[in-house]
Amino acid sequence: MKIPPQRQLAIQYNVNRVTIIKSIELLEAEGFIYTKVGSGTYVNDYLNEAHITNKWSEMMLWSSQQRSQYTVQLINKIETDDSYIHISKGELGISLMPHIQLKKAMSNTASHIEDLSFGYNNGYGYIKLRDIIVERMSKQGINVGRENVMITSGALHAIQLLSIGFLGQDAIIISNTPSYIHSTNVFEQLNFRHIDVPYNQINEINTIIDRFINFKNKAIYIEPRFNNPTGRSLTNEQKKNIITYSERHNIPIIEDDIFRDIFFSDPTPAIKTYDKLGKVIHISSFSKTIAPAIRIGWIVASEKIIEQLADVRMQIDYGSSILSQMVVYEMLKNKSYDKHLVKLRYVLKDKRDFMLNILNNLFKDIAHWEVPSGGYFVWLVFKIDIDIKYLFYELLSKEKILINPGYIYGSKEKSIRLSFAFESNENIKHALYKIYTYVKKV
């Protein structure tokens, strides 16, 4: 922007021209304005709001971390708004969280808080929590030591650490689909090549990987139990086949097992249980069983991998909150976590059955689904041709009902993820009736 001539400014502000000259010299010395000989005096662009905004936008394009797809951004923005019904939300409702147990664990932690140094933690995590996780893993047939366990700020954080600290650039990631990992960009930030294996075709994973057998830098990412979003699980035979193939071709497996403790029938073993050569990197979290805000998960891997990740961790954030780790440890030590799990499984199974009963009454002619034996989700796939994006926006704008459409998880089916974990039964019923009404209308 060009500023008026000195004479005009002196008249406009009723001051001496010398005052204007000195003011211009001062502003120019500070960099606010600049003079072009023969042209005039101009305000520097960086003071222009539009210019600043454009510059920030330009700089953000340089980021190695891609932004989420628009639908995911919108869901993330609305998920904290209590005025909506969140029929797809992937967390426990407030009534299912262990408030009393958490309060007691926090009180126990506070009683010996003076023993804490409150300095920076190491990258491995709280020793007592790592030790008790080792004990629990042993009871599930996974025999590891403290040196094989690292505490993280949740499962997704664990995957991010593996992406930058274990997998090389331009790696090939073979993963099951649909998967919540598709709603993130965690494997895209380092130019990883993503190869999808449909969950219902997992028996063909060997054939698919064989096409890339000459690529040295590759890994398998898989959710073996109660996949998010479909709720499906691998059979024990499928798990054995995957680990056998992994060992034969020296391909690491990233096992994302966040719903490991939420089962409604006899639990099945993790892939890590069959791991004899240390090929499986096992990931889990307390976010789905206690609360997302607790932000505590863990990685089980070979000592060498854990050492590498801990070093990377110290370059990023110096470790997870020691207080959160101590609270989780207290819940595990006094067995209140296990008591909470017994009740949680019972309530979630009951809520699952409530949702399935409504689906059977309303949707059996227009959709199909499977009965999950654990986790949070029912995967609803429509038999009829329907515009899922249109359904998403109609329910959002007219009914304040938020659904997670299947396409954000990499699904090509006309599908939505339903959750029985977050909303009350009353809201579940209301939302399903509204979805049915709009589907029939469309």
Curated annotation (Swiss-Prot):
Gene3D superfamilies of this UniProt entry?
Aspartate Aminotransferase, domain 1, Type I PLP-dependent aspartate aminotransferase-like (Major domain), Winged helix-like DNA-binding domain superfamily/Winged helix DNA-binding domain
SMART domains hit by this protein? HTH_GNTR
Stored Pfam families: Aminotran_1_2, GntR
What residues does the HTH gntR-type domain cover? 2-46
Biological process annotations from GO: alpha-amino acid metabolic process; biosynthetic process
A GO molecular function held by the record? DNA binding
Question: Which residues does this entry mark as bearing N6-(pyridoxal phosphate)lysine?
Answer: 288
Task: Report the cofactors.
Answer: pyridoxal 5'-phosphate
DNA-binding region residues: the ranges are: 6-25
- Give the PROSITE patterns listed for this entry: HTH_GNTR
* Protein keywords: Activator, Aminotransferase, DNA-binding, Pyridoxal phosphate, Repressor, Transcription, Transcription regulation, Transferase
Family label: In the C-terminal section; belongs to the class-I pyridoxal-phosphate-dependent aminotransferase family.
Q: What does this protein do?
A: Positively regulates the expression of the NorB efflux pump and negatively regulates the expression of the AbcA efflux pump. Binds specifically to the promoters of norA, norB and norC and abcA genes. Could also have an aminotransferase activity.
Output this protein's name. HTH-type transcriptional regulator NorG
